[in-house]
């Protein structure tokens, strides 16, 4: 929060009575209010822009040499945990991509560790040159009946609004509870409103009629559009629409045609869930901007969507523009179409120069500490058996680069009254093992699309309850993979037919995040993908993040939880066998 002295100093700079800390000269300023390219010196004092005009003197002068000057980019909805690194490490990845602000929903770690998980994320982000605003998780667990680590009711969330970085209520995923007027979810919404916060939606699979329930209680954003029609339905209903491009949820190309000159002010960008390797090769919101431009959106419009629109969406009045009174979060662009970044300023400090981080800006004196809850289950190989009497079964149809699944009906092989995986038909066994309370709950189902020819993979990243999920060709291989991630305290493992671990990634923080530098995580993810390719013929997608979403019941169409097979259409557990 600013004080009187800082405001007085900024005013003195703006009217020429005092020198600026920094002046940027010879830049072409992207005016996100008017849609114009403008010229003028940019004077910065105490991390804020004091004025644009003629400012001949400063402690430091940067010659932009004709480059474009854009506001810092904003990711309007992201789960840091999907990158499998801590917030302070996440900042090191994002700043070279021009992202200076994120709005995050830490519901992954909250599902494992409750309020302590949220507090850890807030603490770890302190001191990093990145604004991390938090939307409090609304649906922990995502649906009734799941076994996650902690349950967060309104009374647990309310005290967290005191934190200056908490700005609202995150994606309301439990649509049925909204529709039936559940007191707990509506109290959470009321609390957010009373604190002046926004309320995010999660309208996966909802029709325009369903959206009335959302709008009626005050939900004002959505990031789950997978088609232009869905995006327009949400826009017409009065929502801000976040166009998503992540690792699995790749929806921007299918939704971008909804954006027009008249309505673009209601659209912004998000990544939602994106792995480190994709962030490093493609980028973050800068990639969304490029993709939008490649698909017909004017460059300045795309930049507006990534900056001022996102700030307006989340009611952040001092972010998203290069103008007097705004935070000096600035990106230097060599070209508006390619969005090639040369320099990034955060709060008026250069944090990226010539595309390279200035590491001194990213050093944290005290690293936040987190004690992970112990993985707590006792699994027998018999728990992985799937008894069947009917050869016609429901099968989870995994779709590459898509969060939705298909509800398939397939003829399966039964031997001695139990399901037997088929490599030829690509019908594999999938299991979800409850890991938080030693309930003994194990959901077993059938999945198609992973193309395994041997072995198994397992992970403790399993949205949103984050139990252990595994898929494999044999029970023995699945048991080995599950046992390995249990012994490491959480993580991802690939095993071969003999049960040998081909590669793993330990996730020491809640079984979700590594406490290592992102470079090590990137190397391990590459090793995991190489190991997966040794045991699978399926290519062109990320198998680990894809697997982690096959347990999320609030996204259509068929998912698996520790309670069994979950049908989104009926919002209930169904048998594996078709009648």
Curated annotation (Swiss-Prot):
It catalyses: adenine + H2O + H(+) = hypoxanthine + NH4(+). Its cofactor is Mn(2+). The keyword Amino-acid biosynthesis does not apply. Keywords: Hydrolase, Manganese. Gene3D superfamilies: Metal-dependent hydrolases, Urease, subunit C, domain 1. GO terms for molecular function: adenine deaminase activity. It comes from the Bacteria. Its EC number is 3.5.4.2. One of its GO terms (biological process) is adenine catabolic process. It holds the Pfam family Amidohydro_1. Belongs to the metallo-dependent hydrolases superfamily. Adenine deaminase family. NCBIfam families: ade. This is Adenine deaminase. It comes from Listeria innocua serovar 6a (strain ATCC BAA-680 / CLIP 11262). The gene is ade.
């Amino acid at each position: 929060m600013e004080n009187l002295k800082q405001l007085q100093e900024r005013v003195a700079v703006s009217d020429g009575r005092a020198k600026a800390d920094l002046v940027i000269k010879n830049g072409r300023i992207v005016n996100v209010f008017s849609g114009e390219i403008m010229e003028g010196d940019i004077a910065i004092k105490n991390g804020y822009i004091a004025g644009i005009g003629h400012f001949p003197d400063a402690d430091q002068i940067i010659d932009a040499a004709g480059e474009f000057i854009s506001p810092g980019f904003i990711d309007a909805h992201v789960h840091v945990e999907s990158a499998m690194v801590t917030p302070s490490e996440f900042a090191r990845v994002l700043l070279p991509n021009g992202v200076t602000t994120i709005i995050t929903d830490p519901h992954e770690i909250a599902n494992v560790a409750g309020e302590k998980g949220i507090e850890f994320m807030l603490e770890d982000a302190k001191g990093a040159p990145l604004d991390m605003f938090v939307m409090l998780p609304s649906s922990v667990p995502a649906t009734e009946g799941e076994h996650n680590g902690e349950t967060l009711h309104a009374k647990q969330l309310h005290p967290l609004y005191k934190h200056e970085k908490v700005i609202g209520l995150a994606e309301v995923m439990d649509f049925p509870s909204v529709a039936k007027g559940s007191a707990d979810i509506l109290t959470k919404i009321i609390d957010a409103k009373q604190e002046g916060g926004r309320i995010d939606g999660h309208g996966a699979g909802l029709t325009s009629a369903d959206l009335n329930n959302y709008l009626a209680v005050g939900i004002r954003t959505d990031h789950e559009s997978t088609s232009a029609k869905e995006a327009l339905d949400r826009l017409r209903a009065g929502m801000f629409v976040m166009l998503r491009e992540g690792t699995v949820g790749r929806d921007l190309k299918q939704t971008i045609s909804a954006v027009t000159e008249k309505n673009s002010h209601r659209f912004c960008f998000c990544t939602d869930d994106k792995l480190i390797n994709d962030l490093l090769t493609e980028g973050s919101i800068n990639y969304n901007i490029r993709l939008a431009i490649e698909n017909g959106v004017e460059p300045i419009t795309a930049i507006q969507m990534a900056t001022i629109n996102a700030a307006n969406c989340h009611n952040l009045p001092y972010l998203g523009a290069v103008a007097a009174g705004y935070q000096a979060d600035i990106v230097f662009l060599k070209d508006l179409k390619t969005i090639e970044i040369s320099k990034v300023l955060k709060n008026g400090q250069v944090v990226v120069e010539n595309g390279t981080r200035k590491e001194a800006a990213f050093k944290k004196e005290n690293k936040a500490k987190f004690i992970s809850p112990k993985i707590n289950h006792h699994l027998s190989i018999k728990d992985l058996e799937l008894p069947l009497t009917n050869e016609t079964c429901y099968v989870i149809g995994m779709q590459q680069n898509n969060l939705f699944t298909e509800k398939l009906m397939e003829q399966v092989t039964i031997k001695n009254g139990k399901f037997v995986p088929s490599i030829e038909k690509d019908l594999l066994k999938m299991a979800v093992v409850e890991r938080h309370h030693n309930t003994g709950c194990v959901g077993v189902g059938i999945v198609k699309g992973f193309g395994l020819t041997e072995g198994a993979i397992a992970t403790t990243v399993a949205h949103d309850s984050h139990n252990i999920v595994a898929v494999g060709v044999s029970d023995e291989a699945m048991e080995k993979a599950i046992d390995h991630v249990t012994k490491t305290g959480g993580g991802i493992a690939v095993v071969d037919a003999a049960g040998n671990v081909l590669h793993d990634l330990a996730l020491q923080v809640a079984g979700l995040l590594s406490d290592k530098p992102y470079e090590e995580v990137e190397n391990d993810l590459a090793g995991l993908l190489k190991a997966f390719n040794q045991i699978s013929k399926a290519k062109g997608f990320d198998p680990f993040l894809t697997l982690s979403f096959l347990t999320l019941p609030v996204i259509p169409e068929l998912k698996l939880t520790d309670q069994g097979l979950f049908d989104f259409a009926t919002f209930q557990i169904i048998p594996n066998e078709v009648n």
